[in-house]
């Protein structure tokens, strides 16, 4: 298949592109290199995909690119591109979130509608659409009440996907990711920050009391869900939770990191941040039903992989 991966230089996009290439597909990757974090990190993420002669890359923003040309001959679209970050989505920055997350998605859907050859459009949604949930595990039918401007834009884009499916039969699938982690995780995300702090012998900063819980999902499980969403006909039109299968406190995460790092860990507790939810925990029965999805990587295994990755990149920085 000929695949388009948007946000290909990012955390999920780069892993997904590598998997598609290894599976024998042709991949066109697009990325705008938005300055949310260092471009050099994204360039490093692209080293794997760029080693394949079946990979091509276009730098540009989906708002401005000629999408008719971009989608010509494409079978599968994996729409991972977004302006990320819950805490940064307040205030004047919201305009960027609406442009990158809502308007870009609408342009992609409209072009897919008129392009004619798209077999699947998989949208990377987010658990942020649920907001501060009150009952667990969270079902896809649970109340959607985003707790941040970022969550509002992710829900708006997801709703657009659903609308284009029901009105025009654009073959969309929306996957609601729950806290994805692993090698190449963005530097602003908690596990990356935790690993870096340990390596620098600095205290880990936790916002709130550490008893907040998350359903953490390892990157390879998220990639597998995307592949299955592209290949399972029954998935078309569905919205599904993609999660790791366990509810863990941040204090438990610290204990695991101390074990995998072999280093004592110091922690400081700070005020809860605007937009941060207290708990997440997903019901993934729908993904099991339609995708035969079942997460394979335990938190212990995944954190060990992420810590090894962090150790490799920050060792290089120190010795450079």
Q: Where are the predicted features?
A:
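Non-catalytic, hydrophobic alpha-helical segments
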Residues: 222, 226, 242, 253, ...
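Amphipathic terminal alpha-helices
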Residues: 299-320
């Amino acid at each position: 298949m000929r695949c388009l991966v948007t946000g290909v230089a990012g955390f999920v996009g780069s892993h997904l592109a590598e998997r598609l290439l290894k599976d024998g597909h042709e991949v066109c990757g697009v990325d705008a290199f938005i300055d949310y974090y260092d471009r050099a990190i994204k360039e490093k993420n692209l080293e794997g995909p760029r080693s394949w002669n079946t990979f091509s890359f276009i730098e540009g923003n989906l708002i401005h690119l000629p999408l008719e040309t971009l989608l010509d001959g494409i079978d599968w679209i994996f729409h991972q591109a977004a302006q990320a970050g819950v805490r940064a989505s307040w205030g004047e920055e919201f305009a960027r979130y609406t442009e990158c997350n809502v308007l870009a998605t609408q342009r992609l859907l409209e072009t897919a509608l008129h392009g004619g050859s798209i077999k699947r459009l998989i949208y990377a949604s987010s658990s942020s659409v649920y907001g501060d949930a009150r009952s667990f595990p969270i079902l896809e039918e649970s109340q959607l009440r985003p707790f941040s401007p970022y969550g509002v834009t992710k829900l708006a884009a997801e709703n657009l996907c659903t609308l284009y499916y029901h009105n025009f039969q654009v073959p969309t699938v929306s996957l609601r990711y729950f806290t994805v982690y692993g090698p190449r995780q963005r530097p602003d995300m908690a596990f990356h920050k935790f690993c870096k702090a340990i390596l620098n012998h600095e205290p880990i900063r936790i916002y709130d009391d550490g008893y907040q819980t998350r359903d953490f999902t390892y990157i390879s499980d998220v990639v597998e869900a995307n592949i299955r969403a592209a290949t399972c006909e029954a998935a078309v039109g569905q919205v599904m939770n993609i999660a790791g299968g366990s509810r863990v406190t941040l204090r438990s995460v610290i204990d695991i990191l101390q074990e995998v790092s072999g280093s004592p860990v110091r922690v400081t507790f700070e005020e809860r941040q605007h937009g941060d939810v207290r708990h997440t925990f997903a019901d993934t029965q729908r993904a099991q039903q339609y995708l035969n999805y079942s997460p394979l990587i335990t938190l212990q295994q995944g954190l060990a992989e992420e810590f090894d990755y962090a150790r490799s990149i920050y060792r290089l920085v120190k010795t450079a």
